């Protein structure tokens, strides 16, 4: 599959797979100078990239596991969704869960991008469901530990 990608700044880096069978493409910060993530705040980090995602697909943006666990940096709306009709710059929201400022440098791998198929549906309004289940309406802990 080919997905058109545009570099909005010359120093932007294309997403890359780190291993042959990786599912997520690493996304890099695109910065002119270091960016400070203050504790307990969300900061939008630019990637310098925009995409022409095919209509039947969307992107999911997820944290990189090592980056998150080692640095206490999260993506607050994980997974983030990038719709096929969005043409602006891919920005990654990062939340510093730690107690000290964290420095983001140009080229740092800050997130993973996954390409997902989008499924469209026609909702069918009903007054009752025809299929009952053992679980029924039980939620939040109803299936035990």
Swiss-Prot record:
Q: Which NCBIfam families match?
A: dut, PRK00601.1
Q: What enzyme category does the UniProt record give?
A: hydrolase
Q: Which InterPro entries match?
A: dUTPase, dUTPase-like, dUTPase-like_sf, dUTPase_trimeric
Pathway as given in its UniProt record: Pyrimidine metabolism; dUMP biosynthesis; dUMP from dCTP (dUTP route): step 2/2
Carries keyword Hydrolase? yes
Q: Keywords of this protein's UniProt record, alphabetized?
A: Hydrolase, Magnesium, Metal-binding, Nucleotide metabolism
Residue ranges that the Swiss-Prot or TrEMBL entry lists as coiled coil:
none
BP GO terms, sorted: dUMP biosynthetic process; dUTP catabolic process
GO molecular function, one example?
Answer: magnesium ion binding
Protein name (database record): Deoxyuridine 5'-triphosphate nucleotidohydrolase
Q: Which cofactor does it need?
A: Mg(2+)
Q: EC number(s)? A: 3.6.1.23
Function noted in UniProt: This enzyme is involved in nucleotide metabolism: it produces dUMP, the immediate precursor of thymidine nucleotides and it decreases the intracellular concentration of dUTP so that uracil cannot be incorporated into DNA.
Organism the protein comes from: Leptospira borgpetersenii serovar Hardjo-bovis (strain JB197)
Reactions performed catalytically? dUTP + H2O = dUMP + diphosphate + H(+)
> What family does the entry list?
Belongs to the dUTPase family.
Question: Binding of substrate: at which residues?
Answer: 64-66, 77, 81-83, 91
* CDD domains linked to this entry: trimeric_dUTPase (cd07557)
